[in-house]
Amino acid sequence: MKNISFSIISFFIIAFFVTACVPPEYNRDKFEGTSIDFSDKQVQDIYNLLERQSADTLMKYLSSPNPTLRYVAATAFGSLKEKKALDSLAILLKDEFVDVRIAAAYAMGQIGEVRAENILLAAFEKHDTIGTFAKFNATIMEAVGKCGTNARLHDLCSISTFKMTDTLLLEGQAYGIYRYGLRDSYNVESIQKMKYFVENQGFPPSVRLIGASYLSKIKAKYDTTVTTSLSSITLSERNPEIRMALVKTLGKAENPLSILPTLLSLFRKETDYRVKINILNAVNEMPYNSIQPLLFSALRDRNIHVANTAADLFVKNGTEQDAQSYKMASSDETLQPSTKRLMMGAALKWLRFYPRTRDSLNNAMKELYVKTANPYEKAVLLRGLANFGWNHEMLRAEALKTENAPVVRTAATEALAKIICSPDFYRMFQGYSMGVKNQLKAALFDIINSGDAGAATVAAETIIKPEAELNRLRMKEQIPELYQVLQRLKMPAQLEAYDAIYKAIVKISDSTTIKKKKFTTPRSIDWITLTSMTDFSNALIKTSKGDIKLRLLRQNAPISVANFVNLAKSGFFNGKTFHRVVPNFVVQTGCPRGDGYGSLDYTISSELTPMHYNTEGYVGMASAGNHTECSQWFITQSPTLHLDPNYTIFAKVLEGMDVVDKLEVGDIVENVTIN
């Protein structure tokens, strides 16, 4: 390596000369931080300060003579994202212990201040020839991606001398470019760099995955030159996690029909349901006639998530010409029940030219709604009934029925929101449009006043949506009643409702001076539970579809692990439903209401560390923003790198991913045991 004088501005040019070898036994899934002794009272104090978000007191540990305490404190600031800690963290970039340096660099990136850019660049170990600082240098590159200027994106893309065996450095470079992309900072150069990573099989799979995820995530559209090249790569790609990202990328072609043959060919031979789902979503905006055979074929797929994805696309993008076919599918006994319910909604939406058939189906759906006792089946039917706007009175009644399950009330409100925001609103109601609009506005305010956490959240979000076209001036007189609702909410359990109503007040009043209250209610960390565990403690989740075994990541997220263990031992999770399933993304549970808007009377801190959601099976804490976590958690079904900076990872699936992939909305957590 050449010895070149260091310059901050030319940092990444100097980085061209960096070489580092990564041992082949490097384990990407293992967090390589200092081992933490949770019986240490000072360690406990740091986590207690994190839980209380006491940044000022926590900062004293950044100068502790104990490297473990410096490390734990620096990591904590990656969760707090406290700007005032920046200078103290900068000192740790020269710490004698590399783990402390890594934690400090990560935290500085999390803080996101542009002035950290030059500080981070100056700390890059440019003379590291044996890889001692490879992970540290990689962390710096990713951190710059979170806080750097656009000029540094060019420098980051220009690095070309890392060897294909320099796994950590290549990951850092790729993650840095990816983080820029999440900030909507991308260009031809960054696209070409990530495309280069993807197209060359010699690069580590982890780097190729980051590149493919980047291309699928940024908002760019791709010309024929890019999509033609990626099409051949996609067809031959053996890694399904890379393949599913490439499929999503192809769906962003400037000329969508040019890549349709590739996607159709891939769908026919594809065995991974996740890739099939991405193919269906990729063809979503193509002309209906070109994808109609594919969608009807997918309705009969053996995987329920593939079939239901196809049904959803018929709802969104169907045609009047095929409406009768949708109705026939809704009663086809060879289709799965949940698929048939979705096809009812598709038929109801598109049977515009067949009023008698539509009315008959509408009545049948209402009868089925009354007959079924399953609240999640009721919710699907209510959303389907929204496809005929004249059902609004029935939907209002269901949203306000206190005897209805929370998920039903929320779904009814979502259905009303769909009607009032529909681009077909005026076509549907014609001369009655303004009268119906006023009725819907009144219904939404009634729902907000009901105080139901889920329904009120949806209603408050809806009244200020531009597509709802509600006159803000005429709503100003209702601001006092919105304030009254805020006062009645139970905090922090109804935090999402508070946030939605607060935003509605700000929007309607046209004011930027209204202060928002903070409602974090930290709970004392159960150190007895944590110290009685080991780093190999597991959780066994028995569900209605089978068992899932988790490794609890105590070293990575002790607060979240202790919270999860205590809820499990108390029996809290027993009988809870998987209320949210987004195919090829996450399955989520732990909501006391069963609709995703429930919580308990406390919050816990986010624990954001350098771990990545870089494969399936990571278990994270759901939240309504940092430090609002409580009882809800999710399991990923595929790599979800965009979640890294904001969602705690506290466990990893060891066994039972096949069960995770089978879960549907309404499936049950029977019990959770800790081993």
Feature map (PLM): residue ranges:
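Bacterial Sec-dependent N-terminal signal peptides
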Residues: 1-31
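Cyclophilin-like peptidyl-prolyl cis-trans isomerases
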Residues: 21, 360, 403-407, 414, ...
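Amphipathic alpha-helical scaffolding segments comprising HEAT/armadillo-like alpha-solenoid repeats
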Residues: 22-31, 49-63, 82-94, 113-127, ...
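Structural detector for internal amphipathic alpha-helices that build alpha-solenoid repeat scaffolds
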Residues: 30-52, 68-82, 91, 101-114, ...
